Swiss-Prot record:
Region (Disordered): 57-109, 143-165
Family, per entry: Belongs to the EVA1 family.
This protein's UniProt keywords: Membrane, Phosphoprotein, Transmembrane, Transmembrane helix
Topology versus the membrane: Single-pass membrane protein
Protein name: Protein eva-1 homolog B
Record's GO cellular component terms: membrane
InterPro entries, per database record: EVA1_A/B, EVA1_dom
Record's keyword annotation contains rRNA processing: no
């Protein structure tokens, strides 16, 4: 007899909640939006924490390249090569590699360009951007200066120091 009582209690509580929602839709909407915002905020916090706790990837050394002139017909035993090149590092030993800055969020001094042309192109682009920023900073043309624009026959086609063609 306890099971039907629980079923009736669940039904009664559900009907009471439905009646409350019907009577106060603003309250329901507020709680719903509050729950969604809280869930998004919690998700954002967990995402930030997981990113900040993630280990930073270590840069790999230069890839080993095979000599293209070597013949591939000769049988090579890769297992023996791997066993011969394995070395154990002590506590004071370090791996050779590019020196990185001590700041974890600072800029890395690693050349990302593979050719001189790409480097030159990037430098020219940087110079253009610097010139545009300098032009923008030194001042904009005076748009409220003399000159008229419009359908009148005396219109000069200029507005301030700018000329529109």
């Amino acid at each position: 007899m306890d099971a039907p009582r629980r079923d009736m209690e669940l039904l009664s509580n559900s009907l009471a909640a439905y009646a409350h929602i019907r009577a106060n839709p603003e309250s329901f909407g507020l709680y719903f939006v509050l729950g969604v915002c809280f869930g998004l905020l919690l998700t954002l916090c967990l995402l930030v924490i997981s990113i900040s706790w993630a280990p930073r990837p270590r840069p790999r050394g230069p890839a080993q390249r095979r000599d293209p002139r070597s013949s591939t017909l000769e049988p090579e035993d890769d297992d023996e090569d791997e066993e011969d090149t394995v070395t154990r590092l002590g506590p004071d030993d370090t791996l050779p590699g590019p020196e990185l800055s001590a700041e974890p969020d600072g800029p890395l001094n690693v050349n990302v360009f593979t050719s001189a042309e790409e480097l030159e192109r990037a430098q020219r682009l940087e110079e253009r951007e610097r010139i545009l920023r300098e032009i923008w900073r030194t001042g904009q043309p005076d748009l409220l200066g003399t000159g008229t624009l419009g359908p009148s026959p005396t219109a000069t086609g200029t507005l301030g120091r700018m000329h529109y063609y």
